Amino acid sequence: MKIALTGGASGIGAATVERLLRKGHEIVIFDLRKPDVDCPWVPLDLMNTGSVDEALEQADGSFDGLAFIAGIPPRDDNAAACLTVNTLSTCRFIEGFLPKLKDSAAVVSVASRAGLGWQDNTPLLDELMALEPCLLYT
């Protein structure tokens, strides 16, 4: 099976790549850093929407699956980065990748404990999503 995998250069993503390769799957890794394994690699910076779009354009062929494993942990000073990487860019990449998936394909999205604290970010979400009008129409 041909599987696209984000976050495959380190951590859980790298371990997943190794296991899938041992089982004989073809893996295409999307990551900011070049992985240490011999697999096709597409640069992907989830902080940059242009990079997300470029990575989607570079994904050749059709895929049997997508494993979205990339993410960053929350810290006191990176709420906006967490929202961008772990939510907004995740959705952008997955939605953009759907046309490249075969009808029988599976999508797996891995989240960490970072997904548990999303409620703490609702003030930032409100600000970034501009839920209040900037001006009134009359």
Question: Where are the language model's segments positioned?
Answer:
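Conserved small/polar residues in nucleotide/adenosyl-binding loops
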Residues: 137-138
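Rossmann-fold cofactor-recognition segment
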Residues: 36-50
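Conserved NAD(P)H cofactor-binding loop of Rossmann-fold oxidoreductase domains
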Residues: 67-74
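A hydrophobic alpha-helix adjacent to the NAD(P)-binding/active-site core of NAD(P)-dependent oxidoreductases
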Residues: 41, 82-83
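Conserved glycine-rich Rossmann-like NAD(P)H-binding loop of the short-chain dehydrogenase/reductase
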Residues: 23-36
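Hydrophobic positions on the long internal alpha-helix
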Residues: 93-101
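N-terminal Rossmann NAD(P)H-binding glycine-rich loop of SDR-like oxidoreductase domains
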Residues: 6-18
